[in-house]
């Protein structure tokens, strides 16, 4: 766990369990030999907690125990050459039993209909959706030390499991680095003569790594939910809304840059990928946008590159400039092979004119742009555009209007003030509703707004919630 090479092998280990290939077995054995049983177990716990975020501590611990046991046995000198393949196949079969003690993936049942290597590869490919709402709450210093003194090993395992399941989209190397550093702090401070002073000092030292880990989890969760193409669209929308006075030429390279960083770093085994790439990105942000927006300029005055990134990441949408309405691009523009930026231009122009959170705009723009692009594949693209264009424009306008109604007053007010205005609007629309019914509606709508009406709303959760709310809109 102390070197990038080791972490690189750890990623191979994640696949070796399912694949059982000789060359992967050799990597696992080398890893086991280098780390030793204790650190290998810790690394496995982080890896499988991350891979199975819905698994219980007991389920993940049981899987880790089995993996470590088979690795120790099959990597021992004089072990049967078939040991590794036989044991991993048995582990795979055990995962398919109805009373399996191991954590379950969505899709496990389908994988279990397959046999041999095909089953192992199927299980290796299964992924949970990102945990968009981490529930981890750090205990008090006294609670931490009480649990640590009671059973240091059990405390460490529980912490690694809980933290890794909550922040599992952060790169594996970052999770390993942070959890190891955190446990080192606990070990030092809970045996210190002045635990409070010790925790204060050590947390200050850990602040940068903690922030990098949690923020990486957040941006990588969004990337995992959207994929590369839609992430690029999402990043373009956000920047257009934060700095609507900028030009496309200022914003598009930045949207592409952060998308490329996430593509490279979210699954990287290198511990310094995010730590190196994000500061470089903030320099580009400030070079391109600090003169275009006063809030951006303020963010660029922060002391560290990470603080600059956090400031710009959480920056809300700016006030809309007064601009003429934007029209859908023509078939001539869309179908022109030399005009590669036409869809980006439309996305940018619509976004900087529209007071509506990114999750809404990404949801409606992706199918709209795709539908327009499909006209280029038919023989008579002009007729296709003439037929689709007005309908798409009407659907887009209707969706935006409904979305703006759902999020009305949210970003401009405190939450208390927002709920007050929401209650007034609902009362005007539903004069016959009882106070109890109104209160229930206010809570329902405000819960939705608090999760889905800000610039960095969680895309997976909000996708289905937006559908439900639009069906019930008053």
From Swiss-Prot:
Quote the subcellular location field of this record: Secreted
Spans traversing the lipid bilayer: none
Biological source species: Homo sapiens
Query: GO CC terms on record?
Result: blood microparticle; cytoplasm; cytosol; extracellular exosome; extracellular region; extracellular space; lysosomal lumen
> Its GO biological process terms?
vitamin D metabolic process; vitamin transport
Q: What are the disulfide bonds?
A: 29-75, 74-83, 96-112, 111-122, 145-190, 189-198, 220-266, 265-273, 286-300, 299-311, 335-376, 375-384, 407-453, 452-462
Tissue expression: Expressed in the liver. Found in plasma, ascites, cerebrospinal fluid and urine.
Modification(s) after translation: Allele GC*1S is O-glycosylated at Thr-436. The trisaccharide sugar moiety can be modified by the successive removal of neuraminic acid and galactose leaving an O-mceeN-acetyl-galactosamine. This conversion is thought to produce a macrophage-activating factor (Gc-MAF). Only a minor proportion of plasma GC is O-glycosylated. The potential N-glycosylation site predicted at Asn-288 is thought to be nonglycosylated.
Gene Ontology terms, MF aspect: actin binding; calcidiol binding; vitamin D binding; vitamin transmembrane transporter activity
Stored Pfam families: Serum_albumin (PF00273), VitD-bind_III (PF09164)
Quote the function comment for this protein.
Involved in vitamin D transport and storage, scavenging of extracellular G-actin, enhancement of the chemotactic activity of C5 alpha for neutrophils in inflammation and macrophage activation.
Q: What is this protein called?
A: Vitamin D-binding protein
Lineage, top ranks? Eukaryota, Metazoa, Chordata, Craniata, Vertebrata
Quaternary structure annotation from Swiss-Prot or TrEMBL: Associates with membrane-bound immunoglobulin on the surface of B-lymphocytes and with IgG Fc receptor on the membranes of T-lymphocytes. Interacts with LRP2; the interaction is required for renal uptake of GC in complex with 25-hydroxyvitamin D3.
